[in-house]
A protein has these predicted regions:
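Concave beta-strand-loop units of leucine-rich repeat
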Residues: 1-27, 31, 37-79, 83, ...
Length: 175
């Protein structure tokens, strides 16, 4: 598993468009300050066993990634999502299994198409507000798995996987 120390060199990848750090031991995202072109970021299930808060809990460095379109961040310890105010271009967002309770930072996306918020601290009223705010978006509030109900069955998911395997940027992520 990659660690915080391993990821320090990522700050030199200033043209990075897609980054998968899922299922590692990364909780320091300071390298994101140098990735303004990033459009895809996977931070699923990052944890340390020797800290008081074993899961990744601070997403504040995402503010340096304004072009971010796809954020897969489930199974964490994030409660403060105010950084989402800096991410107007999010299209796909999965923040399931995080103790998120403030819906206000989820209400200003201009391009949102998919939002997964299973097992968060958001209320039924928050869910209804999100459905009103994004009537054309697919929003998952109920479920028993962070990738159930189609998260990994969407064309952007398959395009992203192909990008990782073949080292190119798919047209779906060029906008």
């Amino acid at each position: 598993r990659l660690t915080n120390e391993d990821c320090k060199v990522l700050k030199y990848c200033t043209d990075m468009v897609a980054l998968d750090l899922g299922h590692n031991k990364v909780t320091d995202l300071s390298f994101l300050e140098y990735m303004p072109e990033l459009k895809i970021l996977i931070l699923v299930d990052n944890w340390l066993t020797d800290t008081q808060s074993p899961y990744l809990y601070d997403l504040s460095m995402l503010k340096y990634c304004p072009k971010l379109m796809y954020l897969e961040f489930f199974v964490g310890d994030v409660s403060d999502i105010s950084v989402f105010d800096y991410l107007p271009n999010l299209v796909d967002l999965n923040i399931s299994y995080n103790p998120i309770s403030d819906v206000s930072h989820l209400l200003n996306f201009t391009k949102l198409e998919r939002l997964y918020i299973e097992h968060t601290s958001l209320t039924e009223q928050d869910y209804e507000l999100l459905k009103e705010t994004y009537p054309d978006a697919y929003i998952v509030y109920y479920g028993e798995g962070s990738v159930d109900q189609g998260w990994r069955e969407h064309e952007r998911y398959f395009a992203m996987i192909d990008m990782f395997h073949n080292n190119y940027v798919n047209d779906l992520f060029k906008n």
